[in-house]
C-alpha cells in the first residue's frame, strides 16, 4: 500500500487519532505511546511567538488540527503550508476558511524538492513530519536550504529506541501500512543530524518516543 493511499484511507479518522478525542484514540495515545500529542503540539507551538512577523513554512501542514488556533493569532506572519497529500490540504483549507484565516497559503509539494528559493523563510515548522518522509536526509537538506541564516527550525517527530511497545507498533503496523516510512532515527542519530546542520544552536528533548527540537541556523552557511 502506498503512502498516498494509506493517508487517503485514514482521512476520516486522522484528527481523532492525532488528538485522542475518541475513547479508542485516547487509549492509543496514552497506553501505547504514553505521550499526549496535544501537549507536545502546545510545547512546539509555544516556541513561536504570536507576534511573529516574518515568513514561515509549515511542512507538512497536515490538516492543521493543531495549528489553526495558533495561526489565527499570528496575524502579522506570512505563512505557507506545504503537504504532499491533497486530501490533507483540502481539510486544512476548509479549516482555515471556517476560521477566516487569510494569511496562510497552501501548496501541494514534496519536502525533498521545495518550490522556494534558498534563504526564503524566517521560520520552518515541521510537526510529525520526518517519520513519514521517505528521503529524510534530502528533507533536512531542503529545510536547511530554504531557511534564512538566523532563522528557526522547530518541530517534533518519532524516534526509535525509547519505548518498546511504540517501536513494535511502528514496525509491525505503521511502517507496513505506509503511515510511517523507515528508516527511523534514534535520539542520538537525530541529535547528530541536527547538530551537523545547526552546530551548537540545537535544543532537543524527547517525550518518550517523540523528539521535540528547536534549532537556529548559523549566520554563515557551512
Regions found by a protein language model. Give the residues of each.
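A short acidic, Gly/Pro-enriched loop at the edge of an enzyme's catalytic core
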Residues: 112-123
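A short SAM/SAH-binding and catalytic strip from SAM-dependent methyltransferases
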Residues: 123-135
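C-terminal alpha-helical "lid/dimerization" subdomain adjacent to the S-adenosyl-L-methionine
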Residues: 20, 28-29, 34, 154-213
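Short glycine-centered segments of the SAM/dcSAM-binding site in methyltransferase folds
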Residues: 55, 150-152
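C-terminal lobe and adjacent flexible extensions of AdoMet/dcAdoMet transferase-like proteins
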Residues: 213-222
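Class I SAM-dependent methyltransferase SAM/SAH-binding core
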Residues: 55-113
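Conserved class I S-adenosyl-L-methionine
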Residues: 1-50, 65-69
Amino acid at each position: 500500500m502506498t503512502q498516498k493511499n494509506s493517508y487517503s484511507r485514514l482521512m476520516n479518522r486522522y484528527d481523532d487519532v492525532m488528538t485522542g478525542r475518541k475513547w479508542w484514540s485516547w487509549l492509543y495515545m496514552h497506553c501505547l505511546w504514553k505521550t499526549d500529542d496535544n501537549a507536545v503540539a502546545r510545547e512546539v507551538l509555544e516556541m513561536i511567538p504570536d507576534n511573529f512577523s516574518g515568513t514561515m513554512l509549515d511542512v507538512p501542514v497536515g490538516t492543521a488540527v493543531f495549528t489553526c488556533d495558533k495561526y489565527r493569532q499570528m496575524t502579522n506572519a506570512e505563512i505557507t503550508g506545504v503537504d504532499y497529500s491533497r486530501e490533507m490540504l483540502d481539510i486544512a483549507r476548509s479549516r482555515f476558511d471556517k476560521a477566516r484565516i487569510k494569511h496562510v497559503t497552501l501548496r501541494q509539494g514534496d519536502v525533498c524538492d521545495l518550490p522556494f528559493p534558498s534563504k526564503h523563510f524566517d521560520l520552518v515548522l515541521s510537526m510529525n513530519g520526518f517519520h513519514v518522509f521517505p528521503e529524510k536526509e534530502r528533507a533536512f537538506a531542503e529545510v536547511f536550504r530554504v531557511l534564512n541564516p538566523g532563522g528557526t527550525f522547530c518541530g517534533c517527530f518519532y524516534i526509535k529506541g525509547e519505548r518498546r511497545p511504540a517501536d513494535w507498533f511502528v514496525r509491525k503496523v505503521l511502517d507496513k501500512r505506509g503511515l510511517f516510512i523507515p528508516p527511523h532515527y534514534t535520539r542520538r542519530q537525530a541529535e547528530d543530524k541536527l547538530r551537523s546542520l545547526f552546530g551548537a544552536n540545537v535544543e532537543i528533548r524527547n517525550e518518550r518516543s517523540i523528539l521535540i527540537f528547536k534549532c537556529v541556523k548559523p549566520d554563515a552557511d557551512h
